[in-house]
Amino acid sequence: MGQVASMPHRCGTYVLELHEWYRKFVEECPSGLITLHEFRQFFSDVTVGENSSEYAEQIFRALDNNGDGIVDFREYVTAISMLAHGTPEDKLKWSFKLYDKDGDGAITRSEMLEIMRAVYKMSVVASLTKVNPMTAEECTNRIFVRLDKDQNAIISLQEFVDGSLGDEWVRQMLECDLSTVEIQKMTKHSHLPARSSRERLFHANT
């Protein structure tokens, strides 16, 4: 997803600010370690509940650099620092890990669609209304058309970075950028979430 983060925003989603995650991390994990189960729990507390579980798992995997199933402060702070102060290329390289689920260095259509569906599910729950939204499939297809330059049905890291830097719509959908994140939050006097101005990302933008 520009995820903390844009992460992938997207197909219309928001993700929390990593600084808020860090605060909760310190409060809820004073040991300095967090498991996937714990991460899913506090991720759901500040987004849209259980509908965020699939996306939370992908974010956790991207944070867990050494693949030991635990995220420590070092891994977490490294991601925060990079997403807050890194170059556009750095942010896109981190975003790439979210979509490259099997870590083989390439994103397949099914891998991207899986993330887009998870993000889309979160957005549907958080949004009040949407007019003619793009589907997760349409979003994935559009991104593949624009990024898969050699048409070999996969997106390499180079294609992901170069294509996103050269296409503002794709970059908005995929880049993790702390400065552009907006969070759906419950209003003080209502059980309904406030509508985010970034819902426009659900719509076709050519």
UniProtKB/Swiss-Prot annotation:
One of its GO terms (molecular function) is calcium ion binding. Ca(2+) 2 binds at residues 100, 102, 104, 111. Transmembrane segments: none annotated. One of its GO terms (biological process) is visual perception. Residues 31-49, 51-86, 87-122, 135-170 form the EF-hand domain. A lipid is attached at residue 2 (N-myristoyl glycine). Ca(2+) 1 binds at residues 64, 66, 68, 75. Retina; inner segments, somata and synaptic terminals of cone receptors. InterPro entries: EF-hand-dom_pair, EF_Hand_1_Ca_BS, EF_hand_dom, Recoverin. It comes from the Eukaryota. Keywords: Calcium, Lipoprotein, Metal-binding, Myristate, Repeat, Sensory transduction, Vision. Gene3D superfamilies: EF-hand (1.10.238.10). PANTHER family: CALCIUM BINDING PROTEINS (PTHR23055), SI:CH211-245J22.3 (PTHR23055:SF85). Binds two calcium ions. Does not stimulate guanylyl cyclase (GC) when free calcium ion concentration is low, but inhibits GC when free calcium ions concentration is elevated. This is Guanylyl cyclase inhibitory protein. It comes from Lithobates pipiens (Northern leopard frog).
